[in-house]
C-alpha cells in the first residue's frame, strides 16, 4: 500500500523543481556553447539553416532561437510527465518497495526517472563531448536532488499508521478490505479509510483503541471509518469466548 495521491502531490512539486532546473541548465549550456551549437545546426539542417540557405546568418540564429524557445520547453514538458508518472507509482507502491529508508526508496525511483529520460532522449543536449559531460554530470546530481525532495514531500503528505490486533489469531484488522494486521502503512494525511475487524467464531470483539492521529467514527463498532490526521496506531481488541 501507499498513497497514490500523495505521490502525485509530491511528484508535482518535486517535478517542477526537477524539470525547471533542467530547463535552466539546458538554456545556459546552449548559450555557453553557442558557437558549437550553431555549427551543429548548420551541419545537420543545412537546407534550412545552413550556409546554402537564403540569408543564412539570420536563419541559423532563428534556428538557434527555436531550439531555446521550443526544444527546451518540450523536453521539460515530457520530463515532467515522466517524473509525475513515476512519482505516482512511488506513492502507490511505497510500502511494497524494498528497504526501510524513505530517502533510498525515493532516490531509487528518481534514478528510474533519470534512466528513462536518457534512454528516450529527454535528458538534455549531447551535441559534443563537452555538452555530454556537462549534461551527464548535472543530470546525476540534479536527479539525486529530485529524489531527496520527492521523499521529503511524500513524507509531508502522508502519515504512518501501525495496524495492530490484541490477538492476531482471534482478530484480523482489515483496512479498505486489505488485511494489514501487524503492519505499519502510509496513508494520505487527512484521509478516511474503511476499518473492519474480522473476528473468529470463538472470540468477541471488544472495540478499537486508536492512538495518536487516528480518530474513529465509532470505536465500538467492528466496522467503522478511520480518519487519519497524524502518525499513530489502531488496535483491535478481542477476547476469547468462555
Task: For the regions a language model picked out, list residue spans one by one.
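Juxtamembrane/disordered regions of integral membrane proteins
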Residues: 1-160
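Conserved "repeat-terminator" motif of extracellular CCP/Sushi domains
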Residues: 158-165, 219-242
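Exposed beta-strand and adjacent loop surfaces of beta-rich binding modules
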Residues: 158-160, 170-172, 192-194, 204-207, ...
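Non-cytosolic beta-sheet module surface loops
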Residues: 164-167, 199-201
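Short, solvent-exposed S/T- and G/P-enriched segments that are highly enriched in secreted/extracellular
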Residues: 178-194, 218-226
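Surface-exposed interfaces of beta-sheet-rich extracellular modules
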Residues: 192-219
Amino acid at each position: 500500500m501507499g498513497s497514490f495521491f500523495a505521490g502525485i502531490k509530491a511528484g508535482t512539486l518535486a517535478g517542477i523543481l526537477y524539470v525547471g532546473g533542467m530547463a535552466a541548465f539546458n538554456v545556459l549550456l546552449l548559450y555557453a556553447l553557442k558557437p558549437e551549437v550553431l555549427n551543429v545546426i548548420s551541419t545537420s539542417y543545412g537546407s534550412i539553416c545552413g550556409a546554402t540557405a537564403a540569408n543564412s546568418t539570420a536563419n541559423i540564429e532563428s534556428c538557434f532561437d527555436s531550439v531555446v524557445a521550443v526544444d527546451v520547453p518540450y523536453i521539460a514538458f515530457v520530463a515532467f510527465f515522466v517524473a509525475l508518472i513515476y512519482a505516482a507509482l512511488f506513492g502507490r507502491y511505497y510500502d511494497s518497495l524494498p528497504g526501510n529508508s524513505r530517502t533510498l526508496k525515493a532516490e531509487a525511483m528518481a534514478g528510474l526517472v533519470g534512466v528513462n529520460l536518457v534512454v528516450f532522449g529527454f535528458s538534455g543536449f549531447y551535441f559534443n563531448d563537452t555538452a555530454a559531460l556537462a549534461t551527464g554530470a548535472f543530470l546525476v546530481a540534479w536527479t539525486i536532488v529530485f529524489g531527496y525532495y520527492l521523499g521529503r514531500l511524500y513524507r509531508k503528505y502522508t502519515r504512518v499508521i501501525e495496524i495492530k490486533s490484541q490477538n492476531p489469531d482471534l482478530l484480523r484488522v482489515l483496512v479498505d478490505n486489505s488485511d494489514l494486521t501487524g503492519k505499519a502503512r502510509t496513508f494520505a494525511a487527512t484521509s478516511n479509510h474503511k476499518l473492519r475487524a474480522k473476528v473468529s467464531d470463538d472470540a468477541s470483539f471488544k472495540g478499537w483503541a486508536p492512538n495518536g492521529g487516528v480518530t474513529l467514527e465509532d470505536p465500538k463498532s467492528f466496522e467503522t471509518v478511520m480518519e487519519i490526521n497524524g502518525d499513530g496506531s489502531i488496535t483491535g481488541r478481542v477476547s476469547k469466548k468462555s
